[in-house]
Amino acid sequence: FEGLLENNPNIKNLDSVVGFLRASGYFTLRPFLNSINKVRMLIGIDVDKYIVKANNQGHLFFGAEEEVKQDYLTQLRKDIENSVYSSHVEEGIWQMVDDLVSGKLELRAHPSKKIHAKIYLLYPDNFNEWSTDGCAITGSSNLSGNGLGISQDKQYEFNVMLRDNEDVQFAKDEFELLWA
């Protein structure tokens, strides 16, 4: 993702469909998302406890009063201060919560399908039939430490990048159907 995002400044959106989302994956990917305006993640069959907690709490105050937001953030701060997380995890949690609160990150679990696909769509805000800088990456990598190759116990992953506009549009249309 680093090279792709650094060399394609017009890319402003990341949509992903993954079977597994691990905090380690989001925390690793996050430094490269500063130029991205919107991240939408559709999660399939497994979400770890950090993601579940952040997402559930985030949904509690979307559209709610400012007082509820502040109460939750105070509660989260106490939880983190009293935990044994590393500073990397703590920073990642704060960034993830901030991304959820700001609307930069949206997480959904599909209500009826057990999703196993791994698809990453990167495209500009004005993506259309004439766009040349969008891409779809599909393969075996979930958004996890293993999937991104950062874990000690690395596993073989195989992914393919599709750049033809028709392929990207097809993947984007499929994502929108699942997201709806």
Regions inferred by a protein language model and the residue ranges of each:
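PLD/PLD-like phosphodiesterase catalytic module centered on the HKD motif
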Residues: 1-180
